[in-house]
Amino acid sequence: MKINKKKFLYLVSPNKISKHFYKDLIDILKLNKVSFFQLRLKKESYKKKLKIAEKIKKICKKFKVIFLINDDPKLAKQVNADGCHLGQKDM
């Protein structure tokens, strides 16, 4: 996916995803100002992260936003995310 240099906001998810989060995310992405979205769920189970990631991946794809998973290459690969953010301690 090509990066649009006119829109370069990088959003990071909250640690907990509420039921209203998806609508809020859609409303933000509709503004066409975001290039990247990083899913960062440190305390959720793998199963729950997978379910959330699949929903958010579809939303990001619709709005042509690069979708990244935080600290979980296995999950990133499973949902076919655009990438995985790894901190220095994770390498």
Task: Report each predicted region and the residues it spans.
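Conserved N-terminal beta1-alpha1 strand-loop-helix module at the mouth
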Residues: M1-M91
